[in-house]
Amino acid sequence: NALFLITALTKYPEYTGIISLGIHEGVAYYDTRKQFISDMQKIFSNYSNGRIKIDAPFLKWKKPMIYQYCIDNRVPTKLTYSCEKSGRKPCGLCNSCLDRSKWNASSLYKI
């Protein structure tokens, strides 16, 4: 997540606005926590003179809540994926891919 943020900052140094991350509750990595957002915001505020805000709208949401939000709002999730291997296509084996498969297979969540 830090790499994504720093890449955005260096690619668009004159940008003014909000950069949103899709991090959510239930993942135990530093870069998926409120403290990470706060730490990165300090860097971005200094670098951009306060022009850029980092947002994580799903930070306190569990994955099933996000899936339901996608269903309710007709988000075209077939155009997205979450894979820890970072390839062009989902690997189908990492925890993120397995979670997504589980929810897609559920009768409650048809995305």
Q: What are the residue ranges of the model-derived segments?
A:
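Nucleotide-activated chemistry modules centered on ATP-dependent adenylation/adenylyltransferase
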Residues: 1-111
